[in-house]
Amino acid sequence: MSISSKTEDSDIRSSVMTDHGPSGMKRLAGLSLAALGVVFGDIGTSPLYAVRECFHGEYGITASAGNVLGVLSLLFWALVLIVGLKYLTFIMRADNDGEGGILALTALIITHSRNRGYERWLLVAIGLFGASLLYGDGMITPAISVLSAIEGLQIIAPAFHEMVIPLTMLVLAGLFLFQHNGTARVGALFGPIILLWFIAIAILGIIEIVKYPQVLQAMLPWHGISFLLGNNLKGFTVLGAVFLSVTGAEALYADMGHFGRRPIRITWFLLVLPALLLNYFGQGALLLSSPGEAHHPFYGLVPSWAMIPMVLLATSATIIASQALITGVFSLTQQAIQLGYLPRLTVTHTSARHMGQIYVPAANWSLMVGTIGIVAWFGSSSKLAAAYGVAVTATMLISTILFYYIARDLWKWNPAALNVMITFFAAIDLSFFGASMSKLFHGAWVPLAVALVMFTIMNTWKQGRKLLMRQLQDRTLTVDEFIRSLALQQPQRVPGQVVYLTANPDVVPIALLHNLRHNKVLHSEVALFHFSNERVPRVPNSRKIEVDRLGDGFTRVIARYGFLEYPNISQVLALANQQGLNFKPEGISFFLSREKIVAGEKTKMFPSRKKLFALMARNALSATAYYDLPSGQVIEIGVQVQI
């Protein structure tokens, strides 16, 4: 699943919605092709392992005619109901100013939900855990995708078996080491390569279906129902492997803001769904005629002369699918920073044209270590499949829950109809989640453990910042009180323009009080800058800056930024000066407070979490670097705070 945003894409998206002429159709086609490389890479490479795991994996079932038709029926209806009906028809209606994804949906609930108190806290916690699951998915998906593609080498020649793991680790290492360069130059190739991939897998499927057309009767739902009823618990556990066919469906919703609903829907129904079904049914036809091919039915469709080109194409497709997920983790990390769930981290823009193309070193190296470690630990894509899926099923279930509250509280949908719909989708989600959880002790715990760690980190940072702000607020006074005190006892004023960054626009920054207490002077022009992180993707320039003249040489500037934007001090100064601030950038001194966190007995936070918060605070990117302040004009004042 990936979450990303590009300013130019938003403009194109808008024009596609309004322009139905030749130019509009051309733009729609271009956007649909681009969506192929970003949105559909994950779900598009699932044929490499989904059918195989149903019949050959650790939880596989015998490849009899009834079982093959039953599994194909479940695959068909999973794609139709989960992707086509649930996501493309309903979930994609829930957007936060055009943006999709778990965090965007959670922010929408915080802003508009009528729930208060414990219920609202629980919804936010569920949404935050859903976002945390992406980090676990971000380690598993590249590992299983690239590994399953390169495993085709051992089909070409069994002697290549020993090379599979080292080659996979080498490809993954190269992928992560390349991230700092961005994808601007090679990104244009993603769409055409994935297009070629879908055409190739569709042709491979058609060739086998023509030989065994009886396989098409698997579209009848009775075959799937009969399979589940006839195989009892074994059939239920196979659902976990069936679900591998829809991993990546969440990306359709998460990347909605990147490409828009229409291009994603058109691409899915006209190309992706037909290609996937043709390949899955082709693999089924192969198993009906040759059950012995269950060890790798995908490569069983490939003629011997095309095996090497197909392995190369599959590897390229899985690298692109992994790239989309890595980019999604970068974007999610940036959103979490902006929404106050993670400390400030280095975020590098890799493209001057596209604001959505970013690189987050901390996230990149964490994913690299985790992904390569997972490949080394599990050793095969079949073993990895047991760990795959549980994070995605949990995310889908969480999306269903959050969607219910949006439809109920924000859209005021008919309660009876909404309850029926949500019960139907929740039953599907719970079935797949239960089947995936049956593999808990065979690797499914890995992404859950990663998600739990990330949830703890994000929740600890959010709670720690609240406690820190409360402690600082108790040690200062309000801006109004401070301005009134100046009229009673005016300190010595010295010429100069200074900016104090403040986390709370209503109270005096600690740095200002310490400067006044120790230096006994106050500058003639003082601006209090507050960066407000809004729960919307973007804030237009017309509403971004609020300038408030407080009197006695004081001005308060509130800069509002969305969770997909990056704070920019130069932009803030320019917009504020347009409203009469008249601060000269080269002559400003920036005063910051740097808090030293000390674990104490003043708050109820667990000692271990206090230590974790203090550790994150010490290693967070400095405000000077994060806001790109001119280092030669910055004065930092230290303050020790006990929590």
UniProtKB/Swiss-Prot annotation:
Residues 1-20 are annotated as: Disordered. The chain crosses the membrane at residues 28-48, 65-85, 121-141, 158-178, 187-207, 224-244, 268-288, 301-321, 358-378, 384-404, 415-435, 440-460. It is found in: Cell inner membrane. One of its GO terms (cellular component) is plasma membrane. Residues 1-12 have a biased composition (Basic and acidic residues). InterPro entries: K+_transporter, K_trans_C, K_trans_N, Kup. The keyword Transmembrane applies. Belongs to the HAK/KUP transporter (TC 2.A.72) family. This is Probable potassium transport system protein Kup. It comes from Chlorobium luteolum (strain DSM 273 / BCRC 81028 / 2530) (Pelodictyon luteolum). The gene is kup.
